[in-house]
Curated annotation (Swiss-Prot):
Protein name, per record: Protoheme IX farnesyltransferase
UniProt cross-references to Gene3D superfamilies, sorted A to Z: UbiA prenyltransferase (1.10.357.140)
More about this protein: Carbon 2 of the heme B porphyrin ring is defined according to the Fischer nomenclature.
GO biological process, one term: heme O biosynthetic process
Catalytic activity of the protein: heme b + (2E,6E)-farnesyl diphosphate + H2O = Fe(II)-heme o + diphosphate
Subcellular localization(s) per the UniProt record: Cell membrane
InterPro entries cross-referenced by the UniProt entry: Protohaem_IX_farnesylTrfase, UbiA_prenyltransferase, UbiA_sf
Primary location group: membrane
Family to which this protein belongs: Belongs to the UbiA prenyltransferase family. Protoheme IX farnesyltransferase subfamily.
Pfam families reported in the protein's UniProt record: UbiA
Top enzyme class: transferase
EC number: 2.5.1.141
Gene that this sequence comes from: ctaB
Keyword terms, alphabetized: Cell membrane, Heme biosynthesis, Membrane, Transferase, Transmembrane, Transmembrane helix
C-alpha cells in the first residue's frame, strides 16, 4: 500500500482549504451580518411590505460584494497595526497567509463588480452609494480618521450606516426621510457598540498607536459618551416609528429601555469604582440592533396603519 501517495493529496487539499479560509477571513464575514440585518428591513419599509424577491436578491448580492471588497481593502490598509494587536494578530495579512497584492486585487475587483452589479440590477444611485461607501470606509476612516482622532468611529461609522441607504434607494431610486432615520440609528449605535469592545482591548490600541477613545480617555469619560450615544440611538428609533405602526414603536420602546439600562449600569459601575463588563454591552448591542430591525421588517410586511 502506497501510504505516501495517499498522504500527499491530503496535504495539498489541506493547504488549499487553509488558503481558501484565509481569503474568506479577509472579507470579515461576521461584519456582513450588519448588511443583512439592516438592508432587508430597509427594502421592506421602502415599499411598505411589498416583496420584490429578485430585486432584493440582487441588492443583497451587490451589497455583499461591496462589503467584502471594503473589508478586504481595510485589511490591506490595517496590516501594519493588525500585526501588533493581539486581537487581530491572526488575521491573514498579519500572519502573511495571503500576499498583499492578492488581497488588494481581490478588494478592488469586488468593489468594481459590486458597482456595476447594483447599477445594472437595481439602479445607478444604489451603485454610486456602494462605491462611495467603500471609498469612505477605506480612505476616510481606515487611512485617516482611525489613526488621527479619538472620534474616529463616530464619523467613520457612517460607512456602516450605508446598507440601509443602498437598500432603500435600490427599491425606490430615491432617498427619503425614513432612510435617513435608519441611517441615524446605526450612526448613533456604532460608538457605544465599538467603544464597549475597545474598552476590553484598550491596551491593544495603545500599543498600536490607534487613538480609539478608550485608549486615550478615562473609563468614566468613555462610559459617559457611551451613555449619550445610547440615548441618541433610542431617540432615533422612536423617530422612525412615525413611518411605521404601533408594533415597531412598541418594540423599539421596550428594546430601547433595555439597551439604556445596560448603558446606565456600565456608567454607574465605573463611577462607583466597581469591576465592569463592557464586553457584555458590546454583545448585547448586536442583539438590540437585530431586534429593532427585525421588528421593522415584520411591521413592514404586516403593513398595519402607520402612526403619523
Amino acid at each position: 500500500m502506497n501510504v505516501r501517495g495517499r498522504v500527499a493529496p491530503r496535504r495539498v487539499t489541506g493547504r488549499a482549504m487553509s488558503t481558501l479560509l484565509a481569503y474568506l477571513a479577509l472579507t470579515k464575514p461576521r461584519v456582513i451580518e450588519l448588511l443583512l440585518v439592516t438592508a432587508i428591513p430597509a427594502m421592506l419599509l421602502a415599499d411598505r411590505g411589498a416583496i420584490h424577491p429578485l430585486l432584493m436578491l440582487n441588492t443583497l448580492v451587490g451589497g455583499m460584494m461591496a462589503a467584502t471588497g471594503a473589508n478586504t481593502l481595510n485589511c490591506v490598509a490595517d496590516a501594519d497595526i493588525d500585526k501588533v494587536m493581539k486581537r487581530t494578530a491572526r488575521r491573514p495579512l498579519a500572519r502573511e497567509a495571503v500576499p498583499t497584492r492578492n488581497a488588494l486585487a481581490l478588494g478592488l475587483t469586488l468593489t468594481v463588480i459590486s458597482f456595476f452589479w447594483l447599477w445594472c440590477a437595481t439602479n445607478l444611485l444604489a451603485g454610486v452609494l456602494a462605491l462611495v461607501t467603500v471609498a469612505f470606509y477605506v480612505f476616510v476612516y481606515t487611512l485617516w480618521l482611525k489613526r488621527r482622532t479619538s472620534q474616529n468611529v463616530v464619523w467613520g461609522g457612517a460607512a456602516g450606516c450605508m446598507p440601509v441607504m443602498i437598500g432603500w434607494s435600490a427599491i425606490t431610486g430615491t432617498i427619503a426621510w425614513p432612510a435617513l432615520a435608519m441611517f441615524a440609528i446605526i450612526f448613533f449605535w456604532t460608538p457605544p457598540h465599538t467603544w464597549a469592545l475597545a474598552m476590553r482591548y484598550k491596551q491593544d490600541y495603545q500599543v498600536a498607536g490607534v487613538p480609539m477613545l478608550p485608549a486615550v480617555a478615562t473609563e468614566r469619560q468613555v462610559t459617559k459618551q457611551i451613555l449619550i450615544y445610547t440615548w441618541l440611538t433610542v431617540a432615533a428609533t422612536l423617530v422612525l416609528a412615525l413611518a411605521t405602526s404601533w408594533l415597531y414603536g412598541a418594540v423599539a420602546l421596550v428594546a430601547g429601555g433595555w439597551f439604556l439600562t445596560m448603558a446606565h449600569q456600565l456608567y454607574a459601575g465605573v463611577r462607583a469604582g466597581e469591576p465592569v463588563r463592557p464586553l457584555r454591552l458590546f454583545l448585547q448591542s448586536n442583539n438590540y440592533l437585530a431586534v429593532v430591525f427585525c421588528a421593522l421588517a415584520v411591521d413592514s410586511v404586516i403593513a398595519l396603519p402607520t402612526l403619523h
